[in-house]
């Protein structure tokens, strides 16, 4: 397996809704999920080349990739009440949407985020790493400051773990737990291609980020002090 380290800088806020949470109460995972990272690389390949076949090639190169993240020492999370437009159940020609309210969480990284990607076919996707423009929601903009090949990621880097490892890990130490999604090793490109007409079922599998951190809280904010 070959490893690449990406140094990511988020000039603004990051937001990525916890899987299966309501869009009206959209709490955020404090780090991008493995599926978000992999699908962003696929989308970047298609966007920059205009070639869906190239996106498919990158998909199979990164589908089974090992993803690790080393966050900054602190992560700030703000909770915001926003106005939103929701599609009406019985829309009319003049009124398609209705005004509602929702809660959003936005994550602020005071320093860079280090992302580690390990896979066998890293050379297929490596040229697209530096072209990443967002992770998570489309307004979670970023730019890649540095790309370098490494032997292996540091042990302190966070990895999304499956159910079996999760049960064992939390029995030993206390963690802050965030559910995330990864792409199944059985997933096909047609299932994530919105124009293929194929079923998107069983594309993702649930995993968990276990984060060692102290939490400071206010009424509409919290601060995670990461402990590696």
From Swiss-Prot:
One of its GO terms (biological process) is defense response to virus. NCBIfam families: CRISPR_cas5. The keyword rRNA-binding does not apply. Keywords: Antiviral defense. InterPro entries: CRISPR-assoc_prot_Cas5_N. The keyword Acetylation does not apply. This is CRISPR-associated protein Cas5. It comes from Archaeoglobus fulgidus (strain ATCC 49558 / DSM 4304 / JCM 9628 / NBRC 100126 / VC-16). CRISPR (clustered regularly interspaced short palindromic repeat) is an adaptive immune system that provides protection against mobile genetic elements (viruses, transposable elements and conjugative plasmids). CRISPR clusters contain spacers, sequences complementary to antecedent mobile elements, and target invading nucleic acids. CRISPR clusters are transcribed and processed into CRISPR RNA (crRNA). Belongs to the CRISPR-associated protein Cas5 family.
């Amino acid at each position: 397996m070959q490893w690449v380290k990406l140094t990511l800088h988020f000039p603004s806020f990051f937001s990525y809704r916890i899987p299966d949470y309501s869009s009206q109460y959209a709490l955020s995972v404090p780090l991008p999920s493995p599926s978000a990272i992999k699908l962003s690389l696929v989308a970047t390949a298609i966007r920059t080349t205009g070639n869906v076949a190239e996106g498919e090639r990158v998909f199979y190169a990164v589908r089974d990739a090992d993803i690790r993240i080393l966050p900054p020492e602190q992560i700030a999370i703000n909770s915001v009440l926003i106005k939103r437009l929701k599609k009406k159940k019985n829309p009319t020609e003049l009124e398609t949407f209705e005004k509602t309210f929702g809660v959003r969480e936005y994550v602020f990284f005071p320093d860079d985020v280090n992302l580690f990607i390990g896979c066998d076919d890293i050379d297929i996707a490596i040229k697209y790493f530096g072209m990443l423009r967002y992770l998570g929601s489309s307004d979670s903009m970023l730019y890649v400051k540095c790309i370098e090949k490494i032997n292996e990621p540091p042990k302190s880097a966070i990895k999304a773990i499956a159910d079996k490892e999760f049960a064992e890990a939390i029995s030993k130490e206390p963690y802050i737990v965030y559910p995330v999604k990864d792409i199944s090793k059985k997933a096909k490109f047609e299932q994530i291609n919105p124009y293929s007409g194929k079923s998107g079922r069983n594309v993702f599998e649930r995993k968990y980020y276990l984060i060692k951190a102290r939490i400071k809280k206010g009424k509409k904010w919290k601060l995670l002090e990461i402990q590696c």
